[in-house]
């Protein structure tokens, strides 16, 4: 017999609660789907001449407005509280028909202000910045803008596409200095150093690390954009990335020269 139990409560409106603020001993293992508050179907009854009170449940009110030929007597609204281990039962098609709304949101916290959170209206995941929400919303798009030229798989972000293409080309730019292993991502290398060699990273938490410019043609790495451009010109002159990168370097160089000329003019 499942441990689920019913508690009679009035219908509550959809609310957003940041569960990360509660300690573990107060958070518990209870998960309450708010939209589960529905009224059980009642048998048909003849309308009484007296003025009927407005339904206390919004679902019963909506049903009465859709079909005005008969009235529905609202029953007590019931909210179910289910343990976390019973969540797998809610993943079926029956649960999706009710449109459950999670009140236990997953919050992605950053170093931003402690103001209002930006919440995804599809999966209720919350973010501290609007740009983080905009990036997250791409994963819900049905149309994939960036396609892999090897297998045709689509992605919504160029970073994800670049990471996927390395599985076809075999490019592993992040090499371990203590063994012969190499990895396609920096995080995989850092995890390898920590678990296998016991090397702790020197940078602080969420500190921006030095960018590594990777040649996707041969896997050569450069610490500066200028060195990356020189490598492309020397070894891959027909690379489509060379034209785009050269424009960026030219604009940066022009801005530097302009600032130097303006400084000399003021002197």
UniProtKB/Swiss-Prot annotation:
> What is the superkingdom listed in this entry's lineage?
Eukaryota
Q: Name one GO cellular component term.
A: nucleus
Which locations, inside or outside the cell, does it occupy? Nucleus
One of the entry's Gene Ontology molecular-function terms is: zinc ion binding
Cross-referenced Pfam families = zf-C2H2, zf-H2C2_2
Q: Which UniProt keywords apply?
A: DNA-binding, Metal-binding, Nucleus, Repeat, Transcription, Transcription regulation, Zinc, Zinc-finger
Cited InterPro entries: Ovo-like, Znf_C2H2_sf, Znf_C2H2_type
Q: Name one GO biological process term.
A: regulation of transcription by RNA polymerase II
- Classification via SUPFAM superfamilies: beta-beta-alpha zinc fingers
Zinc-finger (C2H2-type) residue ranges come to: 118-140, 146-168, 174-197, 213-235
Biological role stated in the UniProt entry: Putative transcription factor. Involved in hair formation and spermatogenesis. May function in the differentiation and/or maintenance of the urogenital system.
Q: What is this protein called?
A: Putative transcription factor Ovo-like 1
UniProt organism field: Bos taurus
């Amino acid at each position: 017999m499942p441990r689920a139990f019913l508690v009679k409560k009035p219908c509550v409106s959809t609310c957003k609660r940041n569960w990360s603020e509660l300690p573990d001993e107060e958070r518990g293992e209870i998960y309450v789907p708010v939209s589960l508050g529905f009224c059980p179907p009642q048998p048909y009854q003849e309308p009484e001449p007296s003025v009927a009170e407005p339904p206390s449940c919004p679902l019963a009110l909506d049903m009465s407005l859709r079909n005005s030929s008969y009235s529905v007597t609202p029953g007590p609204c019931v909210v179910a509280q289910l343990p976390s281990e019973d969540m797998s039962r809610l993943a079926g098609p029956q649960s999706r028909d009710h449109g459950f709304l999670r009140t236990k949101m997953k919050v992605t916290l950053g170093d931003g202000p402690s103001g209002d959170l930006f919440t995804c209206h599809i999966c209720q995941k919350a973010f501290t910045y609007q740009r983080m929400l905009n990036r997250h919303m791409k994963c819900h798009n049905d149309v994939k803008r960036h396609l892999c030229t090897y297998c045709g798989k689509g992605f919504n972000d160029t970073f994800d596409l670049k990471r996927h293409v390395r599985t076809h080309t075999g490019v592993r730019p992040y090499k371990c200095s203590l063994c012969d292993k190499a990895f396609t991502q920096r995080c995989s290398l850092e995890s390898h150093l920590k678990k296998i060699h016991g090397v702790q990273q020197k940078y602080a938490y969420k500190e921006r690390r030095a960018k590594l410019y990777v040649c996707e043609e041969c896997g050569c790495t450069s610490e500066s954009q200028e060195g990356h451009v020189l490598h492309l010109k020397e070894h891959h002159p027909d690379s489509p990335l060379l034209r785009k990168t050269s424009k960026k370097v030219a604009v940066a160089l022009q801005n530097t020269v302009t600032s130097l000329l303006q400084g000399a003019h003021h002197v």
